[in-house]
Each structure stands twice: as C-alpha cells, then as structure tokens.
Regions:
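Asp-based, Mg2+/Mn2+-dependent phosphohydrolase catalytic module
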Residues: 4-26, 33-211
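Active-site loops and adjacent core secondary-structure elements that bind or stabilize anionic groups
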Residues: 1
Length: 211
C-alpha cells in the first residue's frame, strides 16, 4: 500500500549503508491513512501533494477529487502551484476538514541547503484562510500512538532521534519516550537554550550514539 514512498526512504538509507526492512520504516503517510480510514471512511479528499502522495492514497482506497471535497490534505508538495493553492484555500474557507502531513518548516537538502516543507506551506494557507491544519506527522500524538501500537514497545523502551526541536523532540515531550537531539541538522545548542522543548540527550551526530 505505502511501498513506493516507503521504498524511496529505504533506498536513501541504503546509499548511506544503513540496511532496513520495510516493516521497520514508518512514515507520516502510514499514520494519516490509518487514521482517515478509521474515522473518515468514504470521505472525498482534495490532496495538495505530489503525484506520488496522491498515488499512495488512491492505492489505499481513498476517493480523490478536484471538486467539492470533504477533506483537504496538505502534503510536502514540490509541485505546488497557484491553482492548487487557490483551490485549497477556497475549500478550507468553505469549512472542509483540514489536515496536514507534517509540520516541518524546512526540508534539508544536500550541500546544507533547505527548501520550504509542509509546515511553511501551511502557514502560507493560514495567512489567507485563518485556518491551520491538524498534522499527522511529528509532533502529533497520532504519530507516537501509531509507533507504540505498531511496534508493541512500551514508551520507556522507545528513543526518538532527530534534528528538529519542534517536531522530532517535541513528539516525545511529556511522555516516557527518550528524546535525542542530533546537532548535524536544523537545530543548534542555541536553539535548545531558547526553547521550552528540551531533549533528554544532545549529541553531535549519530556516531556518538552507536559508539
């Protein structure tokens, strides 16, 4: 069901010489599809997203539409254009249920650069409509609940490792899950000092964890 996008991440990890099985890879698509199937079965979706994201939801049995949707779902859309924005804003203003995939503001690229991620697109739409989506990805409670249920692990047996305070580390905030911030990405020690979100551990990079 989610194999195509899931495989994209698995392939990326393999290039980094990290072997992982498909059942070990969980992405926000999994969380969103499971939740929407459980609570909004049969609803029509307008997806602001890439063809790959739309394919994932079509394969999962959802009805996608360009007109009169019940739900607007905002993804990390590298094919975003004005027509998509216009439609999304119109449907959201008209009262559609509104969800977002992930709250990340920026997506890191090779060479240390960043491009706008789903969270930035959500803020753009909020500026026009006054509405902000409920997200499925970190730090959403849906993500942590999904991980616990799918792995069968207890919260105290889980460690969340990431480079973003407001998503990766925040998802573990207020729980028994251990949070580990790596400084090899978006957040810095200065960000930690200024933030109310505090990781349990701070490391320079992943190599410090596996020593």
């Amino acid at each position: 069901m989610y194999k195509r996008q899931q495989q994209t991440y698995i392939d990326k990890l393999e290039k980094m010489e990290i072997e992982i099985k498909p059942e070990q890879m969980m992405i926000s698509n999994h969380v969103a599809i499971k939740y929407l199937k459980e609570y909004y079965e049969g609803k029509r979706l307008y997806i602001v997203g890439t063809p790959l994201l739309k394919h994932e939801f079509e394969t999962a049995g959802f009805v996608l539409t360009e007109e009169d949707p019940d739900i607007v779902l905002l993804g990390f859309d590298t094919t975003l254009n004005y027509e998509k924005l216009k439609k999304a804003c119109q449907y959201i203003r008209n009262g559609c249920i509104y969800f977002g995939m992930n709250e990340d503001l920026n997506c890191p690229m090779e060479g240390g650069t960043f491009i706008p991620d789903c969270g930035s697109m959500a803020r753009l739409i909020e500026a026009s409509t006054g509405r902000f989506p409920e997200f499925f990805g970190k730090p959403s409670k849906y993500t942590l609940d999904y991980i616990i249920k799918e792995t069968g692990c207890k919260p105290e047996e889980i460690a969340i490792v990431g480079d973003r305070l407001y998503t990766d580390i925040a998802v573990a905030d207020g729980s028994e899950v251990t949070s580990i911030l790596v400084l090899s990405g978006e957040s810095s020690r200065e960000d930690v000092e200024k933030s109310d979100i505090k990781p349990d551990y701070i490391v320079k990079d992943l190599s410090e964890i596996i020593r």
